[in-house]
Amino acid sequence: MQTLERIIGEHPFFEGLDHEFMDLVLGCATNVRFGKDTYIFKEGDTANTFYLLRQGNVALEIFAPQRKPIVVATLGEGEILGWSWLLPPYHWKFHAHVLEDTRAIALDGKCLRKKCEENHDLGYEVLKRFAGIVA
């Protein structure tokens, strides 16, 4: 059985993270599972978590009146789900629809924001990694 530290350290988002920072990140992390056809979050909900996807697929959807959901992206193993927790107003911009049973590491955004505010080097490292995704 893999430890949480190893799982996070092997995920592409945190690969190569300094051990000092890893200890801080671990304090905000938990293992989670989501069943097929459930929603991890919905547009407008408060965004306080982000996810390191380990297994499964999740569709990011937007809704328009009188239409079926529009899939704007499908995310899977090794990817990150959610960055709305990082900057105000901390609300999700999409629905996250689970397409197949999914395993992930959930990182508490409030916890990580607090640690980033207390340790600016950690904050810079996290911001650099997210900038590489959204750029």
Please annotate each region the language model reported.
Residues 1-135:
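Cytosolic regulatory regions built on CNB/CRP/Popeye-like sensor folds
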